[in-house]
Amino acid sequence: MSGAAAASAAGYDRHITIFSPEGRLYQVEYAFKATNQTNINSLAVRGKDCTVVISQKKVPDKLLDPTTVSYIFCISRTIGMVVNGPIPDARNAALRAKAEAAEFRYKYGYDMPCDVLAKRMANLSQIYTQRAYMRPLGVILTFVSVDEELGPSIYKTDPAGYYVGYKATATGPKQQEITTNLENHFKKSKIDHINEESWEKVVEFAITHMIDALGTEFSKNDLEVGVATKDKFFTLSAENIEERLVAIAEQD
């Protein structure tokens, strides 16, 4: 980049509302970089009657209570969310998503559908790219549920305000490796979900593919797992995760 171009970029990256001559919003690009700041990878897959999300869990200080560090949030009775990005922004996004879901239920008398919540959060993220007194949140949000009409569902939103549904998805620094692993599986299976009856088997599938893609082993304290069924969203305890890891080891 020439000196003039560098000066131009330096000027435009002070404004989140102004495009550079190259058509870029630098502050939004920086927000995308922030999503990998925590070096956490997550993965979401659909089963026959459930949706499973798993995330790495890294506790930065040995004196921290590990139960207070989480990237998976229960948004409503049926919707869960995993966040990639700084914890403060993650908690802010989770609080707003919970408020939106609660307001929807109060107003209309039924639970907010997963796709509607994802669209709403994406719209809010897009607004943050237009206002000078706001900044984009440096988080990518992945919502999971089992919808009454759509069945097992996964939706993802990003700092630019884009949202889309997925058959399976990965987020984080090793996103490409995990995605390639998943694509290879679905190419062979020729169906768009994990053809297992129980959520336990889908959890084992997700953990196995995370292990294969990252080339590392996990203990029960290295992972978080959330499961969405038709009736509820819940997270697994460390003991439940240990059971699934033992089952995976026995299969090998």
Swiss-Prot record:
Provide the Gene Ontology terms for cellular component: mitochondrion; nucleus; proteasome complex; proteasome core complex, alpha-subunit complex
Pfam families (UniProt xref): Proteasome, Proteasome_A_N
The yes or no answer to whether the keyword Ligase is present is: no
Glycyl lysine isopeptide (Lys-Gly) (interchain with G-Cter in ubiquitin) crosslink site(s): K232
Q: Is Cytoplasm included in the keywords of this UniProt record?
A: yes
Assembly, per entry: The 26S proteasome consists of a 20S proteasome core and two 19S regulatory subunits. The 20S proteasome core is composed of 28 subunits that are arranged in four stacked rings, resulting in a barrel-shaped structure. The two end rings are each formed by seven alpha subunits, and the two central rings are each formed by seven beta subunits. The catalytic chamber with the active sites is on the inside of the barrel. Interacts with CIC1.
The job of this chain, per UniProt, is described as: The proteasome degrades poly-ubiquitinated proteins in the cytoplasm and in the nucleus. It is essential for the regulated turnover of proteins and for the removal of misfolded proteins. The proteasome is a multicatalytic proteinase complex that is characterized by its ability to cleave peptides with Arg, Phe, Tyr, Leu, and Glu adjacent to the leaving group at neutral or slightly basic pH. It has an ATP-dependent proteolytic activity.
Give the UniProt family note: Belongs to the peptidase T1A family.
Its recorded name reads: Proteasome subunit alpha type-1
The organism encoding this protein is: Saccharomyces cerevisiae (strain ATCC 204508 / S288c) (Baker's yeast)
